[in-house]
UniProtKB/Swiss-Prot annotation:
Modified-residue entries (Cysteine persulfide), positions: 410
Organism: Sus scrofa (Pig)
Recorded metabolic or biological pathway in which this protein acts: tRNA modification; 5-methoxycarbonylmethyl-2-thiouridine-tRNA biosynthesis; Cofactor biosynthesis; molybdopterin biosynthesis
Cofactor comment text: Binds 1 zinc ion per subunit.
Job of this protein: Plays a central role in 2-thiolation of mcm(5)S(2)U at tRNA wobble positions of cytosolic tRNA(Lys), tRNA(Glu) and tRNA(Gln). Also essential during biosynthesis of the molybdenum cofactor. Acts by mediating the C-terminal thiocarboxylation of sulfur carriers URM1 and MOCS2A. Its N-terminus first activates URM1 and MOCS2A as acyl-adenylates (-COAMP), then the persulfide sulfur on the catalytic cysteine is transferred to URM1 and MOCS2A to form thiocarboxylation (-COSH) of their C-terminus.
HAMAP family (UniProt xref): MOCS3_Uba4
EC primary class: transferase
Name of the protein described by the UniProt record: Adenylyltransferase and sulfurtransferase MOCS3
Keyword field contains Coiled coil: no
Binding annotation for Zn(2+): 220, 223, 295, 298
GO biological process: Mo-molybdopterin cofactor biosynthetic process; protein urmylation; tRNA thio-modification; tRNA wobble position uridine thiolation; tRNA wobble uridine modification
EC numbers, comma separated: 2.7.7.80, 2.8.1.11
Cofactor section: Zn(2+)
Catalytic reaction(s) noted: [molybdopterin-synthase sulfur-carrier protein]-C-terminal Gly-Gly + ATP + H(+) = [molybdopterin-synthase sulfur-carrier protein]-C-terminal Gly-Gly-AMP + diphosphate; [molybdopterin-synthase sulfur-carrier protein]-C-terminal Gly-Gly-AMP + S-sulfanyl-L-cysteinyl-[cysteine desulfurase] + AH2 = [molybdopterin-synthase sulfur-carrier protein]-C-terminal-Gly-aminoethanethioate + L-cysteinyl-[cysteine desulfurase] + A + AMP + 2 H(+)
Amino acid sequence: MAAREEVLALQAEVARREEELSSLKHRLAAALLAEQESERLLPVSPLPPKAALSQDEILRYSRQLVLPELGVQGQLRLATASVLIVGCGGLGCPLAQYLAAAGVGRLGLVDYDVVEVSNLARQVLHGEALAGQAKVFSAAASLRRLNSAVECVPYAQALTPATALDLVRRYDVVADCSDNVPTRYLVNDACVLAGRPLVSASALRFEGQITVYHYGGGPCYRCVFPQPPPAETVTNCADGGVLGVVTGVLGCLQALEVLKIAAGLGPSYSGSLLLFDALRGLFRRIQLRRRRPDCAACGERPTVTELQDYEGFCGSSATDKCRSLQLLSPEERVSVIDYKRLLDSGSPHLLLDVRPQVEVDICRLPHALHIPLKHLERRDAESLKLLGEAIREGKQGTQEGASLPIYVICKLGNDSQKAVKILQSLPDLDSLLVQDVVGGLMAWAAKVDGTFPQY
């Protein structure tokens, strides 16, 4: 028995190390690519002045040319403007699409990621045939088909402290369409150091928000958020979900603000934050705090005079991928391969699925008992009663005096670890073996059952 436990512990530790190694390899590849790009980034010359619109341009942009607020001079400004878009996902796609359609002269596209099928519900520049291609090349191709006169400059790399300032200085306006906190601080600081306005938006579930930082003496991102939030409190779209239309609404609002800045009209949301609630169909505008004299980036005596280690500052990685928690020891975890062996052996046990009901409706293992993590966190009496009954029923298949092991599973292996901690703290269960399944159901789909849905 002791030997078997050691094998399980070692296998769990190997799985954990493999996951860490995979993450490190990804970061190394991104860093090497960024290093290469920083060494061979071609100079981007300023767009030449434009004295008049061609006959084709007058026809193409005729509906906006007749707007007195824009007119010919505004269109000429757009034609010589350049915009850097950080992130070619749910926000960046509609933003870039409308900027290209409106005739902005140059669009810089920054994204290290590739197109995945799960992107297509909201990232409207990409298509099924382009799965696996770098997002910036997919987006650039779509934009060129829309408007061949717009220059698209793809940067297939992660934005890093080594490259950000150089890139930002090449463009007139910057749009932050990223989905992680370290990149938000990085883009903000680069814009402050380069003296560029920053149009920033975010979207999650049915909600979104947009503002403009560092414009006309207004606040920057650090004025509003001097310190990053605890990493464990941050939810991204992969974890929390998002309705594609919501990212479309916010991306279009970003495009509107960028166009007004580029045309010389000025933005609407410098110093204020627009909140969008799609479920209730409401927009709400709130005033942000003014520029802080003691701001570390844009204050009177700034301490951020160069770009820094933002992943270290924020305690999280600069990616929109789900971060893996390490809350349990190897002895408290089991791989999906080992769990499959246990399942096939017919050994009595209880599998507890702690995902929300909405995820269980997508897919589930038929033999699992479902109790959402939130019910365990609040010690819901009905849920604990259900768990107790399942344990008593399961024990009927064990030898007399033997305990019933409990295995906890979720989507990715994070919530299951939290659930194990809770179960271990319950007095009625403290004598039972409780382990989480490493990698959750997505690991099950990848390593055990290729027909199991991934979401």
